[in-house]
Amino acid sequence: MAAGCEGIAPPTLGERTVGEEGEPVKPFTPEKAKEIIMSLQQPAIFCNMVFDWPSRHWTAKHLSKVLEGKQIRFRMGLRGTGTVPQYETECSYVDATLEEFLTWNCDQSSISGPFKDYEHSKFWAYADYKYFVTLFEDKTDVFQEVVWSDFGFPGRNGQESTLWIGSFGAHTPCHLDSYGCNLVFQVQGRKRWHLFPPEDTPFLYPTRIPYEESSVFSKINVVNPDLKCFPQFQKARRHMVTLSPGQVLFVPRHWWHYVESLDPVTVSINSWIELEEDHLARVEEAITRMLVCTLKTAEDPHHPRTWLNPTEVEETSHEVNSCYLNSAVCAFFDHCEKAKAVELQVLSANGAEPRVQEEHMEVEQAQGPSLTSRAEKQEAVSLFGPDLIPVTPASEERGGALEGDSEESVSSNGGHFAELPCARRQQTSKGASALTEPLAPRGPMAHSRVFVSTDDLLDCLVNPQVTRMVAQLLIQGKSCDTF
């Protein structure tokens, strides 16, 4: 049964493990769950891990009582199937209470209140990215109702989490997160996730306009792509899954995702888990910030906010951006120094000789999650089953098709799961070739009509592959001054 406006759908759980005294037992210890998260390189769903969390009862109606009339900001978007993504800069915003949201969403006869200008059949509403520390600043006791420590992160709770409340059709445009990996607990209603692996980045046409620190957007509406404008998207390998109440989705580092609400009301809680790679990623983000702000401000100094995502409230002056970059570089070197000291302590304790210091610091070239031994990766994959369900490719079709809804992968009782593909996708240099493949002019006069905009230039300058190389060169160059 789908979750309606009032209640919460029954969680889709498989057979629970029962202890000697008949009490339910979680399928993974915190240590094992963390090991899986840190080694797994494809999205997966954890089942039977949150059945005792107090926050499993956090329906929108319950939260409206907890928040006691507190106003929150809702992003308002148009329902529709256009081929252009609805970025946050294209949406309007409403400040309202959860009670007012529920009245508009569930009692469409109401024509008063802050949502009165938004016809329910034409618009969706989304209270997204609501950080607990702000939303519950005077009710910090609720932090303890979210227990991420069950996944192997001691002390992690709601304080490091964000809340998402949406109506049917509410969605986030396709993007990747620059930092960390992601754990998402579905509380009420269902959400469909469209995911693409990091190696598909060239096929997703990445852009940093609108600019938001730590988010790389795709130019494509992945649920209705314009394949004439973005033909490479057909090569992207879509993974699709419907997340139901009681399930926790693990999204590995740098996996692209588009998320849409399928039920009248959806509530989700997530937490981004910090990773070793974030130290270099902060340098990349600081480089991106400086380049985007410099060029866009020079292009239109009188309207500096039009290219910024509404979530960006920081000053964008060159002085501030220079401070960001220098802070990120210093933090990277500080982290390396601490890591080196720990390594020396371990070597000393084991009676081993320390390695000879290289002249220049080597920066890891590979993208993707932390390097993990092949044995650990294979062990994580071997744990797939009713309590750890892999998110597999939606179909043999590529990005342009939407066949093979992943509800086949996650059944209503969580007991059935899709088979793993027999062979992993071969990771060749096709991504790089797609990025650099020249496009032939479409006609004899095509050259004279070409116009290169600032955004076109930025799409090249701050492409994730380019900023990674720039960050590596910067770190290697400054390492001469440091070591």
Swiss-Prot record:
<dbReference type="InterPro" id="IPR003347">
    <property type="entry name" value="JmjC_dom"/>
</dbReference>
<protein>
    <recommendedName>
        <fullName>HSPB1-associated protein 1</fullName>
    </recommendedName>
</protein>
<comment type="subunit">
    <text>Interacts with CRYAB and HSPB1.</text>
</comment>
<dbReference type="Pfam" id="PF13621">
    <property type="entry name" value="Cupin_8"/>
</dbReference>
<keyword id="KW-0963">Cytoplasm</keyword>
<dbReference type="GO" id="GO:0005737">
    <property type="term" value="C:cytoplasm"/>
</dbReference>
<dbReference type="InterPro" id="IPR013296">
    <property type="entry name" value="HSPB1-associated_protein_1"/>
</dbReference>
<feature type="region of interest" description="Disordered">
    <location>
        <begin position="1"/>
        <end position="26"/>
    </location>
</feature>
<feature type="domain" description="JmjC">
    <location>
        <begin position="124"/>
        <end position="288"/>
    </location>
</feature>
<dbReference type="InterPro" id="IPR041667">
    <property type="entry name" value="Cupin_8"/>
</dbReference>
<comment type="function">
    <text>May play a role in cellular stress response.</text>
</comment>
<feature type="region of interest" description="Interaction with HSPB1">
    <location>
        <begin position="88"/>
        <end position="208"/>
    </location>
</feature>
<feature type="region of interest" description="Disordered">
    <location>
        <begin position="388"/>
        <end position="416"/>
    </location>
</feature>
